[in-house]
UniProtKB/Swiss-Prot annotation:
GO terms for biological process: lactate metabolic process; tricarboxylic acid cycle. Pfam families: Ldh_1_C (PF02866), Ldh_1_N (PF00056). The lineage of its organism: Bacteria, Bacillati, Chloroflexota, Chloroflexia, Chloroflexales. Keywords: NAD, Oxidoreductase, Tricarboxylic acid cycle. Catalyzes the reversible oxidation of malate to oxaloacetate. InterPro entries: L-lactate/malate_DH, Lactate/malate_DH_C, Lactate/malate_DH_N, Lactate_DH/Glyco_Ohase_4_C, Malate_DH_type3, NAD(P)-bd_dom_sf. This is Malate dehydrogenase. GO terms for molecular function: L-lactate dehydrogenase activity; L-malate dehydrogenase (NAD+) activity. Its EC number is 1.1.1.37. It catalyses: (S)-malate + NAD(+) = oxaloacetate + NADH + H(+). NAD(+) binds at G9, A10, G11, F12, V13, G14, D33, N95, V118, N119, N120. It comes from the Bacteria. The gene is mdh. The active site is at H175 (proton acceptor).
Length: 309
């Protein structure tokens, strides 16, 4: 029997993730949305791409969570984007309500699933998903670092004039302006990135990475990134379903790692069939650790706001 992947939210990120999951034949896909006709239409359209692209999986579009029962993976992309004039607290409130609704309906139907959160504010919504689902920490994980690291690697490749495939990089922290790219753990085919790029240019790349999502929002005017976020999500899905033991930066629940507790935070981890199989603690220097603590303070503040609601 093929694995079953349920995607909650049939917007750009959800439907694009569904496409790549189908094209890789990672499993059968259930696309869920509250808007009648949207998941059904997108699901049917995607199904009809199968004979052309050469994939053969079952794709179901529905408004009914019953169709998600016994999923191996649940991906949550549903959420409102931050609008002009909207406070951080307003965004947390709106998306917390959506997340509670999605998880409370989906999790009981798939008690052995791994939940991958994609909605924002990412670290806070992942924390909420763990609370609502009651799942163990290894089976609730947030997609942020894979995307942010991909942006970082892209900008480094552009600057160095080399293939993006040869960039190895690591990034930590919350999904936002306080993220922590780590140049000391960044190489080009094993060669330190500083052999290719000056500190000044590297600092500019780090700042562009931090603002990467906003740069695309500003260019699009209406909407936000979806190709790279969905590709990042599918990379995590593949690592879990194929038990690849990938070392990827993900939002993981910490209990003492890096001196942090009761927080979802972007750290390198081993991702496999058990979900987050272990968190890797890098030997950070004082400067890097200070940036991690600053990022953790921002995430903790957001989680504290959630708890007060």
């Amino acid at each position: 029997m093929r694995p079953k992947i349920s995607i909650i939210g049939a917007g750009f990120v959800g439907s694009t993730a569904a496409h790549w999951i189908a094209s890789k034949e990672l499993g059968d896909v259930v696309l869920v949305d509250i808007i009648d006709g949207v998941p059904q239409g997108k699901g049917l359209d995607l199904l009809q791409a199968g004979p052309i692209e050469g994939f053969d999986v079952k794709i179901t579009g529905t408004n009914d969570y019953a169709a998600t029962a016994n999923s191996d993976i649940i991906i949550v992309t549903s959420g409102a984007p931050r609008k002009p004039g909207m406070s951080r607290e307003d965004l947390i409130r709106v998306n917390a309500d959506i997340t509670r609704d999605c998880i409370s309906k989906a999790a009981p139907l798939s008690p052995d699933a791994v939940i991958i959160m994609v909605n924002n504010p990412l670290d806070t919504m992942t924390y909420l998903a763990k609370q609502v689902s009651g799942f163990p920490k290894n089976r609730v994980v947030g997609q942020a670092g894979v995307l942010d690291t991909a942006r970082y690697r892209t900008f480094i490749a552009m600057e160095a004039g080399v293939s993006v495939e040869d960039i190895q990089a690591m990034l930590m922290g919350g999904h936002g302006d306080e993220m922590v790219p780590l140049p000391r753990f960044t190489t080009i085919s094993g060669i330190p990135v500083t052999e290719f790029i000056s500190k000044e240019r590297l600092d500019a790349i780090i700042e562009r990475t931090r603002k990467g999502g906003g740069e695309i929002v500003n260019l699009l005017k209406t909407g936000s990134a979806y190709y790279a976020p969905s590709a990042a999500t599918v990379q995590m899905v593949e690592a879990i379903l194929r038990d690849k033991k990938r070392v990827l930066p993900c939002a993981c629940y910490l209990e003492g790692e890096y001196g942090l507790n009761d927080i979802y935070f972007g750290v390198p981890c081993v991702l496999g069939a058990g979900g987050v199989e272990r968190v890797l603690e890098l030997p950070l220097n004082d400067e890097e650790m200070a940036l991690v603590r600053k990022s953790a303070e921002a995430v903790s503040s957001s989680i504290a706001t959630l708890k007060q609601m």
